[in-house]
Structure formats: C-alpha cells, structure tokens
Amino acid sequence: MSRFYQVTRDNVTKLAELLTQESGITIRSALGAVDRVRKKFFLASEFYSLPPSGIQNEIAPRHGRIAGFLPSWNFPHEIVLQRIAETLFAGYPVVLKAPSETPLTYLSIAKLVDPYLPKGVFNVITSTGKTKHQ
C-alpha cells in the first residue's frame, strides 16, 4: 500500500494540474490537496504495517461487501480520495461513480494505482450525466 504514496509523490504536479484544470481551484490549493492525500496514503500504509502493541486489533473485511462512492463534482477530491484509501487499506473493493463534470482526476488516480492492486479492487465508472425518462 505504500505504493500509493510513491505513485502520488511521483505525480504531485501532474495530479495538481489536472485538478486545477478540471475543478477550477488554484494550483496552490491543488498542490496542497494532492500533498495532503499523499501524506494520508503514507500514514495509512504505516498504520496497517505496525506490529501489534499488546492489545490485539484485527481488521477483518467481510466477503462480498463493496464500498461505493458517489461524490459530487465540487466535493473536495481530497476527502473522497482519503476515504477511498482507508477503504482499500481495510481490505474492501471500491466502486466510484465519477461525477460527469470532473471524471479525469479520479480516472488518473485509478490509472496510477491500478498496477499495484488486484484486478477489480478499485473501479471508476463514468457516464455523461444525462438520463432518459420513459
């Protein structure tokens, strides 16, 4: 899981520029958001690799459960990505329906982390956002 940290560290500028283009926040804000997500990935990977400390805690995912995320286009990507990282580290697969207005940041993250995860563990779904009423 520390690969998430490495991947985001190696692509901070690229992700920040994409976030700026897509959601309209300043590059400075985007760099800060990506940096905070990167640090959360690092902290989560460190937490899950700590040796037991006398009190036995165990994270046991329940088979067949999937976490779904439906963020709005203007919801801070940073918060969504932190929750996704925590969910993946806890052992649950994730399905994220990217907002039709801002899918590129989520698709880029998925592309970066995909080589380090088993197939089907992190999924991003996109759509045009249009529905047809019958």
Regions flagged by a language model, labelled:
Residues 1-57:
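N-terminal Rossmann-like NAD(P)+-binding subdomain of aldehyde/semialdehyde dehydrogenases
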Residues 51-134:
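Rossmann-like NAD(P) dinucleotide-binding subdomain of oxidoreductase/dehydrogenase enzymes
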